[in-house]
Amino acid sequence: CFNPMTVELAEKAMKEYGEDPKIETNKFAAICTHLEVCFMYSDFHFIDERGESMIVESGDPNALLKHRFEIIEGRDRTMAWTVVNSICNTTGVDKPKFLPDLYDYKENRFIEIGVTRREVHIYYLEKANKIKSEKTHIHIFSFTGEEMATKADYTLDEESRARIKTRLFTIRQEMASRGLWDSFRQSERGEETIEERFEITGTMRRLADQSLPPNFSSLENFRAYVDGFKPNGCIEGKLSQMSKEVNARIEPFQKTTPRPLRLPDGPPCSQRSKFLLMDALKLSIEDPSHEGEGIPLYDAIKCMKTFFGWKEPNVAKPHEKGINPNYLLAWKQVLAELQDIENEEKIPKTKNMKKTSQLKWALGENMAPEKVDFEDCKDVSDLRQYDSDEPESRSLASWIQSEFNKACELTDSSWIELDEIGEDVAPIEHIASMRRNYFTAEVSHCRATEYIMKGVYINTALLNASCAAMDDFQLIPMISKCRTKEGRRKTNLYGFIIKGRSHLRNDTDVVNFVSMEFSLTDPRLEPHKWEKYCVLEIGDMLLRTAIGQVSRPMFLYVRTNGTSKIKMKWGMEMRRCLLQSLQQIESMIEAESSVKEKDMTKEFFENKSETWPIGESPKGVEEGSIGKVCRTLLAKSVFNSLYASPQLEGFSAESRKLLLIVQALRDNLEPGTFDLGGLYEAIEECLINDPWVLLNASWFNSFLTHALK
């Protein structure tokens, strides 16, 4: 019952998508119908030389007339987009996201035609929700003679629309007479959006129907309403229209509205990273070529032998809550067992420590409360969970800003090779590899990059040992590798970890470990930073300075700590921080390039005179070279990984909302808010005791001050 040209186009369209018209007959009929309606919509409509529209049905019209509608539907995709682009270029109309069906030269708008076997308003809302464009006009016809169009503007005269409705009625009758109509009517799917295809049945369906707001008869009816809900205009009105109980007063947000975040009081916060950062000291060997080079234990022993200033250890700063003699004994045991290894003919590849009382204590062996089967205790009358104490509030301490500043600095070694950031899966475009190389050059010597490689090494070694030697107290050297300025390889030892029992079944099961790390930092200078550590003095180191050699005490920072499979997995993937900060830099380059309409990568990295905003400090907006920007972004990403915590997650998510409001104010968008107090509460409940979160909050306050000046 369809026009032969329509049939041919519909077959072609389906084949383009790999569908068979003979199998998917309902879809085929729907495509044919839609094509016919589009052609009929444009038939006989012309525009005369004065731009007036007219209808000409008979033979030879005046040659000066121009077709009123451009037909886009029915062309192959490439051609269709070419037509759309040329219309947009000549008329200045916005380019639509989806291919429309027609363009109306009289009204200067694209038209989306819909033909539905369901109710027109439901189909209309689905279409509107899909194309989400104010500019494209929508016109829906149904087989029952109903129609619906944007703003009730039907574009065509009554008679032309009646022709279309009659044709649809005829198609329906012809299908019915062949027994095809029922199947065709029921086969219509909504516009393909994820929600539409998700069928809800059974109990869920009954629950959905029971929980509809008042005045809605069915879930579809409610969905159509929600999809058609345009979130512009006056919010108060929308809210009151939604429910009588809601009354949100929208308060204007002005420069004087926001107050600074309240940072907690209390003792200064303490270091909580899994390994030392700026305070770490390395024992290093250059151009390692010893036997077994690359085996951690061999490398560690070789590094230990480069130092000659060992002395009888003593406690320089006790751990307030711990048994300090045990920490001392643990270090002495490490020295003794390393000595034992050397006395053997063949050095083993791994070293398991003797399970001495000091190590059992430090690793919490037998400390876990005994597990009892629930069946045996469910009759206990006062069975309850432990009361856990609220975390104690801590105030911001200056050390965390110093840690961050140090992480942004350059070291005298390179910590990654050029190809460290992502392997090339495909031949990477020239620009992308150029950006990557420039970026790598800026960050390869950065201290944050050292932290990445150190973190990857420690987490990999610890996860390996946790799986391979579950019951053993394995000694794991903390090692990193780098290249000196002259390109010589270097192996560094930061200290040791001793791993506790590690039967890790779940991702969150904890493995305890004791870390022992070398340092030249005297813990008595900032004792609050080292609250969780017992610090031993273990030797004297000769340092070359401008005034000659000086001897400085060498310390060992010892603490018990713990981690889990999931944390180690993320620790092993710390190289992602390089990628994250590279992407942030790329978006800055993209922004520059789009303004200048050419790729600005080279200028961006090579123009040394230009400065860029790095961040806000109490002094104002800090600026620096592009290299400094790269390193600062990298350091932020690395600290987010090193100091990951629920407090950070909450603070980032909640403070971002306030940030967006302030930015909207800066851009003169006149933002309004309701329950700003609730937002402040949500942000401030994350400010408890975490050094990195507290530092970010104080940066946020600096930003508020300058943004609102």
Swiss-Prot record:
Residues annotated to bind Mn(2+) 2: E73, D101
Binding site for Mn(2+) 1: H34, D101, E112, I113
UniProt cross-references to InterPro entries, sorted A to Z: INFV_PA (IPR037534), PA/PA-X (IPR001009), PA/PA-X_sf (IPR038372)
Chain location of the short sequence motif Nuclear localization signal 1 (NLS1) per the record: 117-132
Motif Nuclear localization signal 2 (NLS2), chain ranges: 177-240
Cellular component, GO, one term: host cell nucleus
EC category: hydrolase
Localisation per UniProt entry: Host cytoplasm; Host nucleus
Post-translational modification: Phosphorylated on serines and threonines by host kinases, including human casein kinase II.
Keywords: Cap snatching, Endonuclease, Eukaryotic host gene expression shutoff by virus, Eukaryotic host transcription shutoff by virus, Host cytoplasm, Host gene expression shutoff by virus, Host nucleus, Host-virus interaction, Hydrolase, Inhibition of host RNA polymerase II by virus, Manganese, Metal-binding, Nuclease, Phosphoprotein
Keyword Kinase belongs to the record: no
Single GO BP term: viral RNA genome replication
GO MF annotation list: endonuclease activity; metal ion binding; RNA binding
EC number of the protein: 3.1.-.-
Cofactor comment: Binds 2 manganese ions per subunit.
Co-factor requirement: Mn(2+)
Function: Plays an essential role in viral RNA transcription and replication by forming the heterotrimeric polymerase complex together with PB1 and PB2 subunits. The complex transcribes viral mRNAs by using a unique mechanism called cap-snatching. It consists in the hijacking and cleavage of host capped pre-mRNAs. These short capped RNAs are then used as primers for viral mRNAs. The PB2 subunit is responsible for the binding of the 5' cap of cellular pre-mRNAs which are subsequently cleaved after 10-13 nucleotides by the PA subunit that carries the endonuclease activity.
Subunit structure: Influenza RNA polymerase is composed of three subunits: PB1, PB2 and PA. Interacts (via C-terminus) with PB1 (via N-terminus).
Family membership noted in the UniProt record: Belongs to the influenza viruses PA family.
Name this polypeptide is given: Polymerase acidic protein
Gene source species: Influenza A virus (strain A/Chicken/Shantou/4231/2003 H5N1 genotype V)
